[in-house]
From Swiss-Prot:
The chain crosses the membrane at residues 5-25. Its EC number is 1.-.-.-. Its cofactor is heme. The lineage of its organism: Eukaryota, Fungi, Dikarya, Ascomycota, Pezizomycotina. Glycans are attached at N174, N286. Keywords: Glycoprotein, Heme, Iron, Membrane, Metal-binding, Monooxygenase, Oxidoreductase, Transmembrane, Transmembrane helix. It comes from Talaromyces wortmannii (Penicillium wortmannii). This is Cytochrome P450 monooxygenase astA.
Length: 493
């Protein structure tokens, strides 16, 4: 054997030995080694990466929590929680502590000179949130109602053209919410409802979201980054770049319009402070963020809610009765009246629990000095999070956790021990979602209009629709539903 081959074999053996030592250290001697969880996950990052690429990590985490308890170690430097106290300890809510910073490896690195509200550091986040909050105030929502209503009514008009036909409700909810948020963010609709198909920009956006997920997974593990990036189709990466370029063009077009209209930009610019306001690059990246956060998540929740209603006829019948007895005509459905639909709100809360639009973990970093989470000290620089889906489906938190029962939010005695404070689909603390009130209004308004006008029937091919993979968000298939005009309903032209 030549000397060169001997050296190469020696180096290979050394590398393998080093890796084995690292795995042994991580599994049995690491500061987190005392936490429960499978030793394989604690030893290496590979099992977690494998399940994230497969899209089944949420179900894996749920099963691990059921086996090991309310806090588990899911990678060498990561802890996952399902106890409601973890929300308070991690976000600083009610504890007098600052919230923990978001992990840049999980949320993506902020673009140079253009942080988004999603991944900005604390100081930038406070400044951006303060400026953007005016677009989501109660007064702004009242002014935006007519714009929102116009898109919902167009959706209903389009669906009426498909009476007695089978439609994909995922697409129709997406058409509606993307058109709505295009109008709110850029001053013009994407035209999805008008054309009854996805605008190329919207298709590009959906593709770029998935690309972003895989890019973040690749960046987490530098040693595998080149290999992982090679699995991301070049077209998908290009679509992500094209999305940012089109966002810039659309925002520039809106800013050139002099008219006053109740969209996000008008409220933001009206309260823009020269010293602490948002720069043009920040406006561009955050307009893009709003489209993603507002449209896709709302459409996802509505799709899931529709599916679970159709799989639970008792709940559907009760909700139909509330909607159809509360209003004498469709014209009465507005921002004020939908707030009185108590069972509707319980249904939406239950849908958010059973099928949260963002079901996974959103990692924070424990400060360098360490911190106490759920009464136990956690070393600094540890990744920590609450896994939404696992927490919401845990028998530790909810009675009959896998059943769709809205009455758990209406005070029924058998659910009195439910730990409802674990349900935080919009987040909590200083980084909670700004658009919570807008989202609830949109969801109530859209679902109320749909149920007022139509009887729905789930098609056999969508019976197991909820069996989905997760790539940050649900990878949703079509939801095939047959539309039937509501019996006895007179439709005015």
């Amino acid at each position: 054997m030549e000397q060169r081959e001997i050296i190469l074999l020696g180096l290979a053996a050394l590398a393998v030995t080093y890796q084995v030592i690292v795995w042994i250290y991580n599994a049995w001697f690491h500061p987190l080694s005392g936490y429960p969880g499978p030793k394989l996950f604690g030893a290496s990052y590979l099992p977690g990466l494998y399940h994230r690429i497969r899209g089944d990590y949420v179900l894996v985490h749920t099963a691990l929590h059921e086996r090991f308890g309310e806090v588990i170690r899911v990678s060498p430097n990561e802890l996952s929680y399902i106890n409601p106290q973890a929300w308070k300890d991690i976000t600083g809510q009610g504890s007098g502590r600052q919230d923990m910073e978001k992990d840049p490896l999980s949320f993506g690195r902020p673009m140079p000179n253009a942080p988004s509200i999603f991944n900005a550091h604390r100081m930038d986040h406070s400044r951006i949130r303060r400026t953007m909050s005016h677009a989501f105030s109660a007064s702004a929502l009242r002014r935006q109602e007519s714009l929102i209503q116009s898109h919902v009514k167009m959706m209903i008009q389009c669906l009426r053209e498909h009476n007695e036909e089978v439609v994909d409700m995922v697409s129709w909810y997406n058409f509606t919410t993307f058109d709505m948020f295009g109008d709110l963010a850029f001053g013009e609709s994407f035209g999805c409802l008008t054309n009854s198909l996805y605008h190329p920009w919207v298709k590009m956006l959906i593709m770029s979201m998935k690309a972003g997920y895989f890019i973040i997974q690749a960046q987490k593990y530098p040693i595998f980054e080149k290999v992982l990036m090679s699995f991301i189709p070049r077209m998908m990466r290009q679509r992500r770049r094209d999305h940012l370029a089109l966002t810039q063009a659309k925002l520039a077009k809106r800013m050139a319009k002099p008219e006053e209209r109740p969209d996000f930009l008008s409220f933001i610019l009206r309260h823009q402070d020269e010293a602490t306001g948002m720069s043009l690059p920040e406006l561009e990246i955050n307009a893009s963020t709003l489209i993603v956060a507002g449209s896709e998540t709302t459409a996802t929740l509505l799709s899931g809610c529709t599916y679970y209603l159709l799989r639970n006829p008792r709940v559907m019948e009760k909700l139909l009765n509330e909607v159809r007895t509360t209003f004498k005509s469709e014209d009465e459905i507005d921002i004020t009246t939908v707030n009185g639909l108590k069972y509707m709100l319980a249904v939406l809360d239950e849908a958010l629990r059973v099928y949260p639009p963002a079901p996974g973990n959103f990692h924070r970093l424990v400060p360098k000095e360490g911190s106490v989470i759920c009464e136990k000290f956690v070393p600094g620089e540890t990744q920590v999070s609450v896994c939404h889906y696992a927490a919401y489906h845990s028998p530790c938190n909810f009675h009959q956790p896998d059943e769709f029962i809205p009455e758990r939010f209406l005070g029924e005695s058998k659910f009195e021990n439910d730990r409802r404070d674990v349900l935080q689909p919009f987040g909590t603390g200083s980084r909670a979602c700004l658009g919570r009130n807008l989202a609830y209004f949109e969801m109530r308004l859209i679902l109320t209009h749909v149920l007022w006008n139509f009887d729905l029937e789930l098609m056999p091919q969508s019976k197991y629709w909820a069996n989905q993979k997760v790539f940050a968000i649900w990878d949703k298939p079509e939801l095939y539903v047959k539309l039937k005009p509501r019996a006895g309903l007179e439709v005015r032209a």
